[in-house]
């Protein structure tokens, strides 16, 4: 029974950590969007979009790792 309780505690800690990581990615993506929308420079907008795409890809990879 103790092993199950330890497992449940570790699982909950991992879930909480994952939620925090996902929130961080969400905030970073939102900041890049704001930066992109505020800029009238095409190069800066393109860089922001690349950053957003990369952050989304990393976030999705983490989600797939956690689910799979």
Explain the meaning of each model-derived region.
Residues 2-26:
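Short, charge/polar-rich alpha-helical segments
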Residues 24-68:
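Short, charge-rich amphipathic interface segments used for partner binding and complex assembly
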């Amino acid at each position: 029974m103790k092993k199950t309780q330890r497992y449940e505690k570790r699982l909950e800690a991992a879930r909480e950590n994952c939620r925090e990581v996902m929130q961080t990615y969400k905030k970073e993506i939102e900041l890049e969007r704001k930066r992109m929308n505020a800029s009238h420079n095409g190069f800066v907008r393109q860089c922001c979009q690349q950053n957003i795409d990369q952050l989304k890809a990393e976030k999705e990879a983490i989600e797939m790792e956690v689910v799979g």
